[in-house]
Amino acid sequence: MTDLHCHILPGIDDGAKDTAVSLELLRREYEDGVRNIAFTSHFNSERTTVEAFTEKRQAAFEQLTAALEGQPMQFDFKLGAEVFFSPGLCELDTRALCMGDTAYLLLEFPTTHKPHFIRQTLYQLQQQGIVPLIAHIERYPYVLEDPTLLYDWVAAGAYAQINAGALLEPKLCKKLCKFIQWGLVHVISTDTHSPDKRPPRMAQGVQQLEKLLGKETAARIVRNGDELFHDQELDAATLHQPKKFLGMWV
């Protein structure tokens, strides 16, 4: 399995504070069956530059790989970022923020409000050869309230990711299952930050998908993560536009 969204690199953001925590998170990922990991530390262009971020990220990665020597775990890693949305994003060297040598960019939106110019920015990114992957769509109230927003972004060429832990919350899981059936969710990841407050729960999330939507759907979403990691086109489900009927999205 592949984890495309995590905060495991030590001391770079609000994730793992040191290599000991990083190693514990990797151990749990390995036990869950994860073998491919994209390290997606937070990047905000209002707080740092791409150059400063990538230098800090590389230093943290080298620190972690040194600590991994002799450990009974083998992974394939890529360096990426969880990039906070801004209308001027396309003016940056966004290729350096993609997941390794892939064209995929993990993009985070504000949770408090829907930002302006999303469609335009998604289009501009794709004109640059970059494929946006929208992070943890379950965390945006405006998307949960109006799934046609996400439909428009996906129809325009973006992909969407959900956190495995969200599938363990019954009410939220019910909504996300609808999103998956509409073809609006493509990959599952952990967004892990720490062993206690936000541990990796990939195996539990996949088991929940199998239970509620069947093994075929769960396998497709897992396979999508593997394909994205290797810069391949995803096996996207047929897209269905959500419609409101008697006050409910169907």
Map each language-model feature to its residues:
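Extended substrate/RNA-proximal surfaces in nucleic-acid metabolism proteins
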Residues: 48-161, 236-250
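Mid-to-C-terminal alpha-helical segments outside catalytic/metal-binding sites
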Residues: 206-250
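Short acidic/histidine-rich active-site segments
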Residues: 184-200
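Short acidic, glycine/proline-enriched helix-loop-strand junctions
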Residues: 48-57, 64-65, 71-76, 197-224
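Active-site beta-loop-alpha junctions enriched in small/polar residues
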Residues: 7-9, 42, 80-84, 110-112, ...
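Non-catalytic positions within long, well-ordered alpha-helices that form the structural scaffold/packing
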Residues: 30, 126, 180-181
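An N-terminally biased module of ancient metal coordination in phosphate/nucleic-acid-related enzymes
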Residues: 1-74
